[in-house]
Amino acid sequence: MSNPILKITDVTKRFGGIMAVDNINMSVYLGKIQGIIGPNGAGKTTLFNLISGIYKPTLGSIHFCGEDITNLKPHRINEKGIVRTFQNIRLFKNMTILDNVMVGCHNKENEDILDALFKTKRHKVEEQKNKNKALSLLDRVGLIHLRYEMPDSLPYGLRRKLEIARALASNPKLLMLDEPAAGMNEQETIELTEFIQSLKSKDMAIMLIEHDMKLVMSLSDSVYVINHGLKIAEDSPEEIVKDKAVINAYLGEEDV
């Protein structure tokens, strides 16, 4: 197997006397979808916050593309190709749908403050490239005809797709989705599942936290199970649903 794009080694996070994440080891690979499941409060979102730099580990290290990113600030981690969404959708309500996606196109590599300030020819060319890219992404998620509308005009499921389109605009190598199906009805969840499946690419890895078992089991190449901050299992979806420790900790009698 190729080298992992993300390698988490012995990562622990304490908040006072609370052990939120306890000695987690994980490898994530390009072209794969890594599912992460566990009960509420298990440490899943804390793990995402550690990877994205919002929290710093108490112990352990995180490497991305072979580089130690453990102590980098969130914006530096983002620039290296790690992009995430959140449980609660975070869109710019006062910007159009198109402008929301264009925000994701801007990064340190292609932006020059003076070019933007004086609206130079180079800036205008770059802005047109960003607009074309944003339009292409909106077309992909079925929102191009609504590009000049405001995000609040969209139903919940489409707002979630818009948030993912904005994340994709920055060309991530690792896309982290935190409960993307939360609050969706059955039809919206089916459409989201198909959309996430369409995102699989040899050039990008996806990490997926999700409570909808049907979604996470149908999409994931591998599933990592956390309970009380500890890993209790890691295997294929087919094996995870048969694991007694997982059933006791999380799945219960739920039909998956």
What is the predicted role of each segment?
Residues S2-V256:
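Glycine-rich phosphate-binding loops of nucleotide-dependent enzymes
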